[in-house]
């Protein structure tokens, strides 16, 4: 009907979402505490928080204090939606600890928080992601973090 220029009604109406207000801009990132959050499912070997690779209901925080680089043998991926080989080979491709430590050393960022947050974002109902997002925001605020770098797949 649409191609012929006739009236039609879609079978799949577009979803509408509540607008999320934009946070205030960071005035000086060189004085800010920065944290990494990923929905790419990077977790320590053994998946200590039992984050599942699809429709995850949990998230975890993982210590990076005193580390300059993430090693592939220490981590695994709990996410079924992408080719994991490149991240398994070098987890810094998803959680760029090496690059962020360089920026911290140069003074480009004030401080890198000593943990990162991870979950799997694959096939997740909006109710789950909203709840987990609120929980993560509480954690970020409680830790005094000023800025978050969100990495995805």
Regions found by a protein language model. Name each.
Residues 1-153:
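Metallocofactor- and cofactor-centric catalytic cores in central/energy metabolism, strongly enriched
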């Amino acid at each position: 009907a649409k191609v012929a220029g006739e009236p039609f009604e879609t079978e799949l109406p577009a979803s509408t979402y509540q607008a999320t207000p934009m946070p205030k801009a960071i005035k000086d990132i060189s004085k800010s505490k920065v944290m990494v959050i990923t929905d790419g499912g990077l977790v320590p070997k053994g998946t200590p928080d039992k984050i599942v690779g699809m429709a995850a209901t949990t998230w975890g925080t993982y210590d990076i204090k005193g580390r300059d680089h993430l090693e592939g043998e220490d981590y695994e991926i709990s996410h079924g939606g992408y080719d994991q080989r490149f991240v398994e080979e070098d987890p810094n491709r998803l959680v760029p600890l090496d690059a962020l430590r360089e920026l911290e050393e140069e003074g480009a960022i004030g401080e890198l928080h000593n943990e990162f947050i991870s979950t799997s974002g694959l096939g997740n109902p909006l109710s789950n992601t909203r709840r987990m997002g609120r929980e993560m925001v509480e954690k970020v605020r409680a830790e005094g973090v000023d800025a978050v770098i969100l990495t995805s797949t």
